[in-house]
């Protein structure tokens, strides 16, 4: 306490955090009563000056940044560019979403920083500026929405809407922006109603699991502890420093600076000592913790440390378990309500950027980089190791150090401008991501075409089989534009045959299609001769069998007419079928095909001179009459005709299958042969050379002038072909650029006819819903993409994550790490000790300790990300209850758990030695319950004490229980039944014949007894009962004081009080109702204490 009194008060700006530190120092130095008077005077001073200032809010005080317009224009241009790239098929929808989200988030953060600068420059005494930045009312995010822009909004499912709100609340919202803002309004209402209940239920579970934890004794005499380090963010900035974490803790070991002892064991750490220790030994400060406390059902005073609101050692009888549960659960309710004020604004983190210091040329070594594709779809360089980028320009030279795994957004020797982003630095800690899926919908109505092969999968959905395709590689999916027309079932069934009678006002004519079976066309390929030269040609002979179907493409769709009779009640219709020739000839041209050789001669083989044949094919003329059908319908007078539009789906040209009624004519092919002779020589690469075609020309020696030619460049031009798919923006000529994407249908001399199409870039792992050549409408789901995105830092995400950690789900990283560490440590220790029976005991202890510290840090990080700090001791108490059980396994092998059999404990022989700490639990408690089942949960301390006694130790493995399961596995079935599953707990306890000793707070409350906390604690009641005896005997025995002073013992007043109380009880021959738990639960006489102290 003397450390706080020596502090000097500095003249500084008293914001919210400074006033908080001032109050802490006032309470520690002057006490609570004096602090209350000082704070009253401070409050009066604040109201007095705020009244004189006359701070009030008006619309004129909401000053917007003058840079907002061009910043938003620049962001819109970037968003439009990414949208165009997505339409071209260069990037897929997820990359476009990432780029848009990060662009607008960067713009919003830049406006937020400019808002602070503009307030300081334009009006430093602006009421909005003073209230928000002093912490009196509002925060920076709320002021940013007033004068900056609202930015990106999350929908109720937590997904980010890619359309940002560019307006602020002062300018007013448009209709679209107002509808998007309603998501945030509804989100606040849902959080207030539902998430508050979740936070309250979380508080109930936390209190339930630790309600029996009370400070019962002073010291458990443990030498173990934990090392607390700074908790850092993903960017590396410290959230919570080590100095703040060790304040109020007790040292587990003495600390030395050289040969000088700067702190002794069991010494509490104040603010000044914490500042010194963090500087002298920042990585090796071992402090005592409730996790390492040796007591079974409670925590000792030194392992807990300072009280939360006292600034001194915690009192005996303090119900620290209830305080811990309330301290963790209560911020959840506050943070839930905070969502209402921010309105669901996205506040994700992005990568750190390196920018160019000035204009110049950037140089770096490319052999340490490899090309890759970043999350925005851009081609970048990935650093394989640490890299140095040197920027040279304007007579200056500057070097930038880029760490490994970073992405370079520029090329070597590229000109960069000042403040241009040249690299993205990967965060030191990976950001929290989640896998989500995004459905991509069709912008066009048409036909789906895959450019890559896909794997067919089956998925049961709503009782039907949904066939989807899984894309293993990167590719494109095209939608060819077209129109879709559908007819109802009544129109399809309104076709009548000859001699039928019909009624009035119904459709009497319709068109139908005939389906016929087809025969395959057999191709017979005959290899006539092989020419080893530039090309290899084959002869093909096709024989078309009789009855082969010819597929005719109907280019012009027919119209459907509906005839409605109005004058005659009944009418007889006569239908005649008149054959006609629809397409008289079938012309099939077989061109010269270029095929690859399946076998080659060996290298350096001379082929003999032979006669080679080169064939050229003429056109094949086939005379094949086809038979079609035509319906004739006589129409009576007074008939009205209505057009129904087109029939069927015309996404692509319809195919009509027609049957040949007459055999085809034979095919006549004229064959032409050309012959030549040549020698050829094959090298090992398979290229052919004409030996006789080489000539050597010898020229006279002449003098030539060396002239340089500059301005040379290569010109590339795409040669369009029919059926080719071309993206928007492609140059088909040197100056002609396509304005739309499509498929080339026909090519003329001065124009190209395209079929309008829309490309979609497919990433690996994308699911394709329609089959190839399927027809879809506009707005149908085309593909589903799986990707990772940053979690929004909001309590909707934060509170379930904290609950997930506290409930220790099976997929939790801490649970998986505990199992892996246990297996690894068991195998390592077994190799050293060569004893599996003892190695798992050490591995269980170490792996459990590592998981406990990791879980404490993870829970602390969740709350720190919301701006709330929880004292580590509260989380440690909850984690201690979660990890206090172990699971018994069979066959002495903790790595192999079986499901059957019994574990019987051999009883120790009579008269065998028992350890001293075993006396705390009656031996009959173990002997009477010597049978256990595999996978049964037993307390870790009980399992350790059992293994101290028996010859063959029982094998067990560590487990991490959630707070719900830990509440249902306690020593009190009364507490379990009052929490959950009352009937199950009571029936199971009755079968097991369990006994409840009613030691916890909840059990005593249920039976109306005094709770064992505070004045109801046995230690405190003993002090009150024997207080008068203590006061009388204290004045008589001054020998005790002299003895203590002569030895210079550093005993606390509480320890002296307890020792002397034990002496008073012994001298009056009165026995207390309970032990005082001093020196292994024994009451020592005064002479014994003196002998111990002398030794």
Curated annotation (Swiss-Prot):
It is found in: Plastid, Chloroplast. SUPFAM superfamilies: beta and beta-prime subunits of DNA dependent RNA-polymerase. One of its GO terms (molecular function) is DNA-directed RNA polymerase activity. Keywords: Chloroplast, DNA-directed RNA polymerase, Metal-binding, Nucleotidyltransferase, Plastid, Transcription, Transferase, Zinc. The keyword Repressor does not apply. It catalyses: RNA(n) + a ribonucleoside 5'-triphosphate = RNA(n+1) + diphosphate. Its EC number is 2.7.7.6. Gene3D superfamilies: 1.10.132.30, 1.10.150.390, 1.10.1790.20, RNA polymerase Rpb1, domain 3. Zn(2+) binds at residues 220, 293, 300, 303. Binds 1 Zn(2+) ion per subunit. InterPro entries: DNA-dir_RpoC2_beta_pp, RNA_pol_Rpb1_3_sf, RNA_pol_Rpb1_4, RNA_pol_Rpb1_5, Rpb1_funnel_sf. Its cofactor is Zn(2+). GO terms for cellular component: chloroplast; DNA-directed RNA polymerase complex; mitochondrion. HAMAP family: RNApol_bact_RpoC2. In plastids the minimal PEP RNA polymerase catalytic core is composed of four subunits: alpha, beta, beta', and beta''. When a (nuclear-encoded) sigma factor is associated with the core the holoenzyme is formed, which can initiate transcription. DNA-dependent RNA polymerase catalyzes the transcription of DNA into RNA using the four ribonucleoside triphosphates as substrates. Belongs to the RNA polymerase beta' chain family. RpoC2 subfamily. This is DNA-directed RNA polymerase subunit beta''. The gene is rpoC2.
């Amino acid at each position: 306490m003397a450390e706080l009194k020596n502090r000097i008060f500095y003249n500084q700006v008293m914001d919210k955090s400074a006033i908080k530190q001032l109050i802490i120092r006032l309470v520690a130095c002057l006490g609570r009563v004096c602090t209350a008077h000082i704070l009253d005077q401070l409050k009066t001073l604040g109201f007095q000056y705020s009244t004189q200032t006359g701070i009030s809010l008006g619309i004129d005080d909401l000053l917007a940044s003058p840079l907002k317009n061009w910043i938003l224009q620049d962001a819109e241009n970037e968003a439009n560019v990414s949208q165009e790239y997505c339409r071209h098929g260069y990037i897929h929808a997820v990359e476009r979403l990432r780029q848009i989200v990060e662009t607008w988030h960067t713009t919003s953060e830049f406006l937020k920083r400019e808002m602070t600068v503009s307030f300081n420059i334009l009006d430093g005494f602006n009421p909005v500026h003073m209230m928000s930045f002093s912490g009196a009312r509002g925060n920076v995010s709320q002021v940013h929405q007033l004068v900056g822009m609202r930015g990106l909004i999350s929908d109720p499912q937590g997904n980010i809407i890619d359309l940002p709100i560019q307006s602020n609340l002062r300018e007013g919202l448009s209709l679209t922006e107002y509808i998007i803002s309603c998501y945030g309004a509804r989100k606040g209402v849902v959080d207030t109603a539902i998430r508050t209940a979740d936070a309250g239920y979380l508080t109930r579970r936390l209190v339930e699991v630790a309600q029996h934890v009370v400070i019962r004794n002073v010291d458990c005499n443990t030498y173990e502890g934990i090392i607390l380090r700074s908790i850092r963010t993903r960017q590396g900035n410290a959230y919570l420093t080590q100095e703040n974490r060790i304040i109020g803790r007790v040292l587990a070991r003495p600390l030395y600076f050289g040969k000088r002892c700067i702190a002794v064991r069991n010494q509490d750490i104040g603010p000044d000592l914490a500042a010194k220790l963090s500087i002298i030994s920042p990585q090796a400060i071992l402090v005592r913790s409730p996790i390492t406390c040796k007591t079974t059902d409670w925590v000792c005073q030194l392992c807990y440390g300072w009280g939360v609101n006292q600034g001194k050692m915690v009192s005996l009888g303090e119900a620290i378990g209830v305080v811990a549960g309330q301290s963790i659960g209560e911020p959840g309710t506050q943070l839930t309500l905070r969502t209402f004020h921010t309105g669901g604004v996205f506040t994700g983190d992005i990568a750190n950027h390196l920018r160019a210091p000035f204009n110049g040329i950037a140089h770096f070594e490319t052999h340490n980089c490899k090309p890759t594709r970043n999350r925005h779809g851009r081609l970048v360089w990935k650093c394989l190791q640490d890299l140095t980028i040197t920027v040279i320009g304007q007579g200056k030279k500057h070097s930038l150090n880029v760490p490994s795994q970073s992405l370079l957004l520029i090329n070597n020797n590229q000109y960069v401008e000042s403040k241009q982003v040249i690299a993205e630095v990967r965060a030191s800690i990976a950001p929290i991501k989640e896998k989500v899926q995004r459905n991509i919908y069709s912008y066009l109505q048409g036909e789906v075409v895959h450019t890559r092969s896909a794997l067919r999968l089956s998925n049961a959905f709503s009782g039907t089989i949904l066939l989807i395709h899984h894309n293993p590689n990167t590719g494109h999916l095209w939608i060819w534009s077209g129109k879709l027309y559908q007819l109802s079932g009544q129109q399809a069934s309104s076709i009548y045959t000859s001699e039928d009678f019909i009624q009035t006002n119904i459709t009497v004519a319709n068109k139908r299609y005939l389906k016929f079976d087809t025969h395959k066309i057999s191709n017979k390929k005959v290899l006539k001769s092989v020419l080893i030269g530039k090309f290899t040609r084959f002869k093909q002979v096709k024989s078309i069998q009789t009855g082969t179907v010819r597929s005719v493409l109907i280019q012009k769709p027919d119209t459907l007419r509906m005839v409605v009779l109005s004058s005659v009640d009944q009418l007889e219709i006569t239908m005649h079928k008149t054959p006609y020739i629809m397409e008289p000839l079938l012309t099939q041209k077989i061109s010269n095909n270029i095929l690859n050789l399946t076998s080659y001669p060996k290298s350096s083989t001379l082929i003999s001179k032979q006669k080679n044949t080169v064939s050229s094919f003429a056109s094949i003329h086939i005379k094949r009459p086809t038979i079609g059908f035509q319906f004739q319908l006589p129409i009576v007078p007074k008939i009205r005709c209505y057009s129904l539009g087109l029939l069927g789906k015309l996404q692509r040209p319809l195919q009509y299958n027609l049957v040949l009624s007459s055999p085809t004519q034979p095919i006549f092919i004229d064959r032409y042969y050309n012959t030549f002779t040549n020698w050829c020589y094959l090298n090992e690469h398979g290229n052919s050379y004409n030996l006789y075609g080489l000539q050597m020309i010898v020229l006279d020696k002449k003098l030539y002038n060396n002239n340089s030619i500059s301005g040379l460049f290569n010109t590339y031009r795409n040669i369009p072909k029919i059926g080719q798919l071309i993206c928007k923006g492609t140059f088909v000529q040197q100056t002609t650029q396509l304005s739309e994407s499509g498929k080339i249908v026909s090519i003329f001399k001065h124009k190209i006819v395209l079929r309008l199409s829309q490309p979609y870039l497919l990433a690996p792992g994308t699911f394709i819903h329609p089959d190839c050549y399927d027809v879809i409408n506009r707005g149908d789901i085309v593909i589903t993409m799986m990707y990772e995105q940053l979690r929004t830092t909001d309590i909707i995400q934060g509170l379930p994550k904290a609950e997930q950690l506290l409930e220790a789900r099976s997929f939790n990283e801490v649970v998986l790490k505990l199992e892996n560490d246990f297996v690894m440590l068991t195998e390592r220790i077994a190799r050293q000790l060569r004893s599996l029976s003892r190695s798992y005991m050490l591995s269980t202890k170490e792996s459990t300790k590592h998981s406990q510290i990791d879980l404490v840090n993870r829970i602390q990080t969740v709350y720190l990300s919301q701006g709330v700090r929880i004292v580590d001791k509260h989380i440690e108490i909850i984690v201690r209850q979660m990890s206090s059980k172990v699971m018994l396994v069979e066959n002495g092998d903790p790595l192999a758990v079986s499901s059957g059999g019994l574990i019987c404990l051999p009883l120790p022989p009579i008269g065998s030695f028992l350890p001293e700490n075993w006396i705390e639990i009656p031996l009959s408690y173990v002997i009477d319950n010597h049978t256990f089942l595999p996978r049964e949960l037993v307390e870790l301390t009980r399992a350790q004490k059992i293994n101290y006694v028996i010859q063959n130790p029982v094998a067990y493995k560590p487990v991490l229980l959630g707070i719900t399961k830990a509440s249902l596995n306690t020593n009190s079935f009364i507490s379990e039944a009052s929490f959950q599953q009352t009937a199950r707990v009571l029936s199971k306890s009755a079968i097991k014949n369990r006994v409840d000793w009613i030691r916890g707070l909840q059990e005593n409350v249920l039976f109306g007894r005094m709770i064992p906390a505070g004045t109801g604690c046995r230690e405190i009641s003993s002090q009150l009962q024997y207080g008068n005896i203590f006061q009388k005997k204290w004045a008589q025995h001054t020998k005790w004081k002299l003895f203590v002073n002569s030895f210079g013992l550093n005993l606390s007043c509480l320890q002296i009080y307890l020792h002397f109380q034990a002496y008073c009880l012994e001298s009056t021959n009165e026995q207390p109702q309970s032990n005082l738990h001093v020196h292994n639960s024994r009451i020592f006489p005064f002479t014994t204490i003196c002998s111990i102290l002398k030794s």
